[in-house]
């Protein structure tokens, strides 16, 4: 059984004893846990991760996957790579809106819908910046939620699809 989440007033921080936590390089931020007040709570916690939104994340390198395995798909970081930006800046829409702003908007809407449906929600990011790299986000989600939804848009026309990874 993994160590319990570090919970303080609804905030969950990276516990350094969790598996793979030692590979995180940006981890001074915290996720926020919301408990559903719906009439029929599900007893399930969904982690909602608004992709991107870590100032300085693009200049720090971490492993592509917390367990050190290489990427199997291409994209911004090519297939076979074992390191990448801790949190990339994401793409920019034609109107100049950054991906991080759109994913944050989507995450807030999804949070409200999940809470109303009886799910507890762990929000990785609720503002323009959270100091949690992709490894910290994944490790927190794996230890403090039942499932992890990472919201992203892609800026290329290849390598599209839904990808699932469990560590």
Please describe what each predicted stretch is:
Residues 1-167:
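Catalytic-site microenvironment of enzymes
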């Amino acid at each position: 059984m993994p160590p319990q989440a570090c919970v303080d007033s609804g905030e969950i921080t990276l516990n350094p004893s969790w598996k793979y936590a030692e590979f995180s390089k940006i981890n001074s931020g915290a996720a926020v846990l919301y408990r559903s007040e719906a009439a029929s709570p599900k007893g399930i916690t969904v982690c909602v991760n608004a992709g991107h939104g870590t100032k300085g994340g693009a200049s720090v390198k971490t492993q592509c996957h917390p367990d050190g395995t290489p990427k199997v798909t291409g994209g911004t970081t090519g297939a076979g790579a074992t390191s990448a930006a801790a949190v990339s800046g994401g793409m920019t829409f034609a109107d100049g809106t950054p991906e991080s702003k759109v994913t944050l908007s989507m995450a807030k809407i999804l949070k409200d819908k999940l809470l109303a449906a009886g799910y507890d929600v762990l929000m990785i990011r609720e503002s323009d910046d959270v100091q949690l790299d992709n490894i910290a986000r994944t490790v927190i989600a794996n230890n403090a939620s039942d499932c992890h939804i990472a919201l992203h848009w892609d800026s290329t026309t290849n390598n599209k699809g839904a990808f699932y990874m469990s560590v």
